[in-house]
Every structure is written in C-alpha cells, then in structure tokens.
Amino acid sequence: MNPVSTSELAALFDCFIPNAGPASFEQLKGGHINLTYKVRLASGAQYILQAVNANVFPNVTGLMENVFRISAHLEKKLSTMDPDPNALRFLRFVPPARQSASLSDDKWYWRVYHFIDGVVTRTEAKSPAEAYTAAKAFGRFQSLLADLPEP
C-alpha cells in the first residue's frame, strides 16, 4: 500500500476519535506487513493509526476479537495488582466511534491504539541483557494470560 494522504488519514482517525483535530501524522517505517502512522494531536496526546494487511491476516475480525479479549483480560488483571506503571504496558485499542466503509476493505483494516511512550521496536536484541529483558517480559505476559478464558 502506498502512503496515505494527510486528509485521508485525518478522515480515518476521525472515525475513532471524532473532532480530535490531529496535528500531524508520521509514517513509522521498518514494518513489512502493516502500514503504521504515529498521530500527534495538538493537545499532546499520541496514538498509533495502523492498517492491518488482510492478505497476511485473512481473518482480521477474529484477530481483533482476540486482541480486544486479551487487552480486557490484562486490564482487569493488572487493576487488581500493585500499581506500577512500568511493570507491564500493553496495547490499549480505541474502538471506532462510528463505522465507515473506509475502515476496511478486502486488503486493509484500520485500527487505532494509544501510543506507548518510551517503547522501541527491535528486530533483534542488541545484547544478551536486552534479550533476557525481552524474554522476561514475554514470560510475564504469558503468565498473565494463563487463566484467559476460551472464546
């Protein structure tokens, strides 16, 4: 997919957070599957606007149902634990405020989630310590999902 125009991105984002007045869109490069933009609002709030590639994920509806189910489970579970904002941060999706034909077609499905400040994406660990930290976080994530009910 070619980059999307600013006016198209603004219209898509408005389906999720109406009248937010996005200040800017920055395409995040490096991914090979989805098309991803960082959205900065004039208020300072930041979001990710992403087009999921339906050619790679043919059951996007099922994918998003699982994502919402896991997010809700983590939110509930973490709310009963000691408040430590750095303990585990995860994607918190923004459901569409209104449906639009432009949110999905046979190739792309658009979604929005809150930007997680201070997080970096890597394709490989830069050191054994970084690999250990990533593995430890993934293990914690898995343990938090151990009691996730079946759909």
Protein language model annotation of sequence segments:
Residues 1-26:
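Juxta-kinase regulatory segment immediately upstream of eukaryotic protein kinase catalytic domains
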Residues 24-151:
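Conserved ATP-binding subdomain of kinase catalytic cores across diverse folds
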